[in-house]
Amino acid sequence: MDSKANIKICQMSQKDIDSIKENFSSDFDKFWSYETLAQDFKSNDSTYFACKTVDDIVVGFIGLKIVLDNADIMNIAVKKDYRNHGIGSLLLKQAILHAMSKNCMQIMLEVNSTNSPAIALYEKFCFQKISVRKKYYNQIDDAIIMQKIL
């Protein structure tokens, strides 16, 4: 990736969801699937943002669900060859701004305890670890629950 100037963040469309099925198939794993993503996208209380190249190719996305004054980040993904270029930060910042615009008081998320890059990203944005679900993933890895007060 050349520059952040060559990308844009926008609200996701159904066309983008279809594109994700093709372009992110190797990024889906045993913990979440395209079908789960597509179903969540259609939910009235969910909002998804995409990071796209100038050629309109989705290279990252984030989804959040807002219920009353609480936002939950449901998922965030960046294509492998676009990682470590600030796209995750741009997506997370957009999600935080959206939650604030909806008068949310906090944002919650869950992350695999082995996902050090994601944990570092969330801590950079002042998310704090508030709880652990032992052996949550595959009865092996812990899930860390993180929260950001807005």
Annotate each PLM feature:
Residues G88, L92, N115-A118, K135-I140:
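Short glycine/proline-centered loop/turn elements that form peptide/ligand docking sites
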Residues Q11-D81, L92-Q94, H98, K102, ...:
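Acetyl-CoA-dependent GNAT
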Residues K79, R83, E110-N112:
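Residue-level recognition of the GNAT/N-acetyltransferase active site
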Residues L37, F61, Y82, L121, ...:
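Conserved hydrophobic/aromatic "anchor" residues
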Residues E110, E123-I144:
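Conserved catalytic-core motifs of GNAT/GCN5-like acyltransferases
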Residues M1-K15, S131, I144, K148:
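Conserved N-terminal entry element of GNAT/NAT acetyltransferase domains
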Residues N84-L97, A120-K124:
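Conserved acetyl-CoA-binding loop-helix of GNAT-fold acetyltransferases
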Residues I73, I107-V111:
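Conserved hydrophobic beta-strand within the GNAT/NAT acetyltransferase core sheet
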